[in-house]
């Protein structure tokens, strides 16, 4: 198999990268009806598999789970999750032959094996679904031509897919139809019904492409969503301790700080996050963000280039063949960092204190979001997709750090995201430690920024620069579709 994207000519590549249309709510008037009465079999019962299945069942669809015989016989976690929630469970041979839609929600590295096992069992003119297009785009998987291939990709972890649905809402979602596999022209109808069944249509759906989803998703998770948070956590904690701060306080400030400051990001973008600061602190955060951009800009664009070319995927798949040697080594090293082993702090940190004492962290968020967004757009990805894969998902990932620090983040995200995170953070961490940390001033981290005289012209120019960045302009529009967003709990 060959990387699908690299088999396309330039016109086709640009067309696929630029597929992005925000769908009108009226297009989902039929909701999940197209799939009602059809048999839907989900392969895999992890976070996405279970929670999408629960939502789809509650939307009136016929859902069952196909698991490997050993998972059933040994009553593994996937079997227990499915059966404890009252789902029918069977082997591939028992369930796949009668399925109208088979949804593959296993980890990326298992996709080729799953396809090889289930495709011979699938009935003629059935459909096959993904929630991430890596197997199609990067691996170059070829699916039988009578099978319709679609994607529904919720832009958040599986647990949030369920929680938002239970509230009567949903999470923003990308849908796509593989252009090589839509023999009956039903792909879009299938994807729309599936998205509606998960609740995604209530938060906004982008009609995209497998290519655009994969390239933007990989970029976001490697850089701002995971890599920048990991690098920032490590260097900020080390700096606080080096400055004599209580290690327990430093650990809590970082662990819960990302979640608290990005909650403002979720509700009102970078503008609101920066508005939580005093004028003096805002100007300093803006200055620090510009310095971070200069230091890390090349790394963001390198990751984007490596993703588009397929170099990243080839490197990671080589590690798959080597039994994930690099992945496991990097995971172990992360577990040994000082931040991961910081003592517990029982004192209270107010919401505003996270902002006042975390100016450097805010600067990292601002710089990281803007760099990731700009790199994606410069590579042909539309602004809507770039927004969802940078700013929108950041509070959700920050929430995982609040639960159990970097360990939890790396457990929740996919192995693909985790591998990319390490590639980025392993380079970004020493750069930040060498070029940014030594030049910090009093009040950049761990204590409030001293008040200085601020002139109106400078403040106006900074405010204009913040509010008029393209990620803020498109974000204001897209957040209008998400007016019922749940507020993530802020720790005390």
From Swiss-Prot:
Q: Which GO biological process entries does UniProt record here?
A: isoleucine biosynthetic process; L-valine biosynthetic process
Task: Identify the catalytic residues.
Answer: 132
Question: Which GO molecular function entries does the Swiss-Prot or TrEMBL record give?
Answer: ketol-acid reductoisomerase activity; magnesium ion binding
Q: Which Pfam families match?
A: KARI_C, KARI_N
Give binding positions for Mg(2+) 2: 217, 389, 393
Q: Which gene encodes it?
A: ilvC
- Cofactor binding mode and count: Binds 2 magnesium ions per subunit.
> What pathway, per the record?
Amino-acid biosynthesis; L-isoleucine biosynthesis; L-isoleucine from 2-oxobutanoate: step 2/4; Amino-acid biosynthesis; L-valine biosynthesis; L-valine from pyruvate: step 2/4
**Where, in this chain's numbering, is NADP(+) bound?**
45-48, 68, 76, 78, 108-110, 158
Please report the name of this protein according to its UniProt entry. Ketol-acid reductoisomerase (NADP(+))
Q: Which family does it belong to?
A: Belongs to the ketol-acid reductoisomerase family.
Q: Which cofactor does it need?
A: Mg(2+)
Supply the alphabetized keyword list.
Amino-acid biosynthesis, Branched-chain amino acid biosynthesis, Magnesium, Metal-binding, NADP, Oxidoreductase, Repeat
The catalytic activity, as recorded, is: (2R)-2,3-dihydroxy-3-methylbutanoate + NADP(+) = (2S)-2-acetolactate + NADPH + H(+); (2R,3R)-2,3-dihydroxy-3-methylpentanoate + NADP(+) = (S)-2-ethyl-2-hydroxy-3-oxobutanoate + NADPH + H(+)
EC? 1.1.1.86
- For Mg(2+) 1, which residues are the binding ones? 217, 221
Q: Which residues form the KARI N-terminal Rossmann domain?
A: 14-208
Q: Which cysteines are joined by disulfide bonds?
A: none
Q: Which NCBIfam families match?
A: ilvC (TIGR00465), PRK05225.1 (NF003557)
Residues engaged in binding substrate = 414
State the InterPro entries in the record: 6-PGluconate_DH-like_C_sf, 6PGD_dom2, KARI, KARI_C, KARI_N, NAD(P)-bd_dom_sf
Boundaries of every KARI C-terminal knotted domain copy: 209-344, 345-485
Which PANTHER family does the entry link to? KETOL-ACID REDUCTOISOMERASE, MITOCHONDRIAL (PTHR21371:SF1)
Q: Supply the source organism for this entry.
A: Haemophilus influenzae (strain PittGG)
């Amino acid at each position: 198999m060959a990387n699908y994207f690299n088999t396309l000519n330039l016109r086709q590549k640009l067309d696929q990268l630029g597929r992005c249309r925000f769908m009108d709510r009226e297009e989902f008037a039929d909701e999940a009806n197209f799939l009602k009465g059809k048999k839907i079999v989900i392969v895999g019962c992890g976070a996405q598999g279970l929670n999408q299945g629960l939502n789809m069942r509650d939307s009136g669809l016929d859902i069952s789970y196909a698991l490997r015989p050993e998972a059933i016989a040994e009553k593994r976690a996937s079997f227990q999750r499915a059966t404890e929630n009252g789902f029918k469970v069977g082997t591939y041979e028992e369930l796949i032959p009668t399925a109208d839609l088979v949804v593959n929600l296993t980890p990326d590295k298992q996709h080729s094996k799953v396809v090889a096992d289930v495709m011979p069992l699938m009935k003629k003119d059935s459909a096959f679904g993904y929630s991430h297009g890596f197997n199609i785009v990067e691996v170059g998987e070829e699916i039988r031509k009578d099978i319709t291939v679609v994607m529904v990709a919720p832009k958040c972890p599986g647990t949030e897919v369920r929680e938002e649905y239970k509230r009567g809402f949903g999470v923003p979602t990308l849908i796509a139809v593989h252009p090589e596999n839509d023999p009956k022209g039903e792909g879009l109808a299938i994807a729309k019904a599936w998205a509606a069944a998960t609740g995604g249509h209530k938060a906004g759906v982008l009609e995209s492409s497998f290519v655009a989803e994969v390239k933007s998703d990989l970029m976001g998770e490697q850089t701002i969503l995971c890599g920048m948070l990991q690098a920032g956590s490590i260097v900020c904690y080390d700096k606080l301790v080096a400055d004599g701060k209580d290690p327990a306080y430093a650990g809590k400030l970082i662990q819960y700080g990302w979640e608290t400051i990005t909650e403002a990001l979720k509700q009102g973008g970078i503008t609101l996050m920066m508005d939580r600061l005093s004028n003096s602190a805002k100007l300093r955060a803006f200055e620090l963000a510009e310095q971070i951009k200069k230091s890390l800009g090349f790394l963001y664009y390198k990751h984007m280039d490596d993703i588009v070319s397929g170099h990243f995927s080839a490197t990671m798949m080589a590690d798959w063949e080597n039994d994930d040697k690099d992945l496991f080594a990097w995971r172990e090293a992360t577990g040994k960092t000082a931040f991961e082993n910081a003592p517990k702090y029982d004192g209270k940190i107010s919401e505003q204190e996270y902002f006042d004492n975390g100016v450097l962290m805010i600067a990292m968020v601002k710089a990281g979001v803007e760099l990731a967004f700009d790199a994606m757009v410069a590579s042909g990805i539309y602004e809507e997709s770039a927004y969802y894969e940078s700013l929108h998902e950041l509070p959700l990932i920050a929430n995982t750090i609040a639960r159990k620090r970097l360990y939890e983040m790396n457990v929740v995200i996919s192995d693909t995201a985790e591998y990319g995170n390490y590639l980025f953070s392993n380079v970004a961490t020493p750069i930040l430690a060498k070029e940014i940390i030594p030049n910090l001033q009093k009040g950049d981290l761990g204590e409030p920024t001293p008040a200085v005289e601020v002139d109106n012209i400078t403040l106006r120019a900074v405010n204009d620069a913040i509010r008029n960045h393209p990620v803020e302009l498109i974000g204001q529009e897209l957040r209008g579709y998400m007016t019922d967003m749940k507020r993530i709990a802020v720790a005390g």
